[in-house]
Amino acid sequence: NMTNHSYFNLNGHKSGSVLHHRMQLLSDAFTPADAQSIPTGEVCSVDGTPMDFRSTKELGAEIDAAYEPLILGNGYDHNWVLKNEGRFDKVAEVTGDESGIVMEVWTDRPGVQVYTANFLENEAGRNGAVYQKRDAVCLETQNYPDAVHQKNFPEAICKKGETYDTKTAYRFHIE
């Protein structure tokens, strides 16, 4: 499952927590994982849960809710099921609360893993920065994790002789 793991803080270098960043995801469902972060095989609706980012809200609005998937992940570290049906389309938008920098995520992949840097602790950065828990967010476009073991997940195997071709773009502007 090829993806990337770029960390973003749209308020800028050394600006601390991303919990006030605002995010919208074009997704009605997510794939919960167990305590070892392995998907359970379920596809669950985001409706009425802290996983619902169909309308823009702050990353920190419900990140510490007493909701099992968030407790197991120590925050957001989940795959959302995208509605793009394999088309290259805008699937997410994140806005820095202080900077007004907007990052749009476009992809043809069926999923996006959102990770809120739940396990960063005293991570050395450039120019003397020290990154802490939730100082960044990752939006990792991908196939569903563990798809090879989950019969109800979309096929994710690239067979000999086949070409793997995918496109993801991160577009930035100021609001």
Predicted segments, located by residue:
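An exposed, glycine/acidic-rich loop-and-rim segment of catalytic or binding clefts
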Residues: 1-175
